[in-house]
Amino acid sequence: TFAMFAAGRAYEQIRNSVAYPHFNVKICATHAGVSVGEDGGSHQCIEDLALMRVIPGMTVLCPADANEAKAATMAIADFDGPVYMRLARLATPVFEGDMVKPFVLGKANVLREGKDVAIFATGLMVNESLMAAEALAKDGIDAAVINVHTIKPIDAECVTAWAEKCGKVITVEEHSVIGGLGDAVADVLMGKVNCKFHKIGVNDQFGQSGKAADVLREYGLTADQIAATIKANI
């Protein structure tokens, strides 16, 4: 069902009847983020990663494409414990060739190497970040792109290594900048790595109705806008 209902309406049941007794329940929520489009702010869940991430013992996933969603489904079927998996409504390009990486719970995948800035992205924003990195390359900025499909437990080793290597970190998510991927990455780096850091996502506001592409642009979540924001913050 919609992430708004799975994570929002059912929150108390998930907390007390699934996570508290640590039952082996998998919650697969679709239509997440502002790319839901015309259904508007009431149905555009931009808080679900934060809500699920804070629940003790909950594993939180956000696949980047159809193949990764399939691999994640198989992985969580074999995993014993509560899991929340976030899926988008919008059609997403399917990665091919070298972009197809093994799916391992809790292990981020480096899709593009770089030395100037490390872009940590999740879900729909992984492809947008790859396109943003291509645009940045034309301006002489060598950006690494890391697909963080597992928000919790986050791959702290990968986050730390790339933050140290690049010295500049950007997080990109189709979610509130409060409590999601950006905060998960910040939690890893705080007090450990001295680097520039900026979160790209939906600021402290609700979504709104419109064509998915238009709404994504309204919140600065298209490839060209991501590239521009990165240039302004590194």
Regions picked out by a protein language model, each given a short descriptive name:
Residues 1-113, 117-118:
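Conserved thiamine diphosphate
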Residues 36-37, 88-234:
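Thiamine diphosphate
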